[in-house]
Amino acid sequence: MDPEVSLLLLCPLGGLSQEQVAVELSPAHDRRPLPGGDKAITAIWETRQQAQPWIFDAPKFRLHSATLVSSSPEPQLLLHLGLTSYRDFLGTNWSSSASWLRQQGAADWGDKQAYLADPLGVGAALVTADDFLVFLRRSQQVAEAPGLVDVPGGHPEPQALCSGGIPRHKDLPGLLVVRELFSSVLQEICDEVNLPLHTLSQPLLLGIACNETSAGRASAEFYVQCSLTSEEVRSYYLSGGPEAHESTGIIFVETQRVQRLQETEMWAQLCPSAKGAILLYNRHPPLQSGVGKSHLSHPSAPALSLQL
């Protein structure tokens, strides 16, 4: 396994639909206060704001744990979530003391992630109608993994479920949180790749991967089928979108070549979240064999193409 990524959860073959996932949102799943208080987080945030005055704080969902429930008629996944923030993420997962915090969490709570913000991300193994996976070259201007290759993705937003004010656990029903989790990955594809929503299938959850370069932050990785060909996707991407500034190019890799992507030079260019998405995608052969897919035409584009 690549040291930059680990797999926390592998969903049953073929992935899980929105109806097969549930959420328990509770303050018990929030980050523990740091030993000695959270002043270090405040100091890191103030320093970062001085260097990058355009950054802003925002609430995020925190992944505490995930449980597959095998006793139900169909496979069910229960996600135990809390609330956290981007500010706390920078002050814990991205802090120079992240390794020490993991050691202390294990010693104090039996959980190495106890003191970490661990905001839950989302990512997509997006497959075109002619059987190519879609990747994006990240801009040098983004805060995380600048210049590396990623899959479309981002974060589910607690704020999307609130009309205003600070999101509170009691105001966020589990069903709405699940809906936001699944809809957010589609929204990220629409914003980053500039694709119409009606061209995208309902997401299937493949599993959860952890970015070990940011102290084990988790990301839910999904499979999404697009009804457009790779050339049609490229055309939409090049016409620009709401988050066009976050990437500088689009890359297409033929799905049959993805199984051996770790053996290519491209693997070293992938950011950890993309590596997690590919590792999980490769563990779901039913999706690669065409089960549940729309009709696929033969690829006419090269196996690897980059548009700068």
Swiss-Prot record:
Signal sequence, start to end: none
Top-level division of the source organism's lineage: Eukaryota
Similarity section: Belongs to the Nudix hydrolase family.
Disulphide connectivity of cysteines: none
Keywords: Hydrolase, Magnesium, Metal-binding
Gene from which the chain derives: Nudt22
Record organism: Mus musculus (Mouse)
Binding sites annotated in the UniProt record for substrate: 56, 86, 138, 143, 150, 155, 157, 273
Binding site for Mg(2+): 188, 192
Annotated Nudix hydrolase domain residues: 117-284
UniProt key word Magnesium: yes
Protein name, as recorded: Uridine diphosphate glucose pyrophosphatase NUDT22
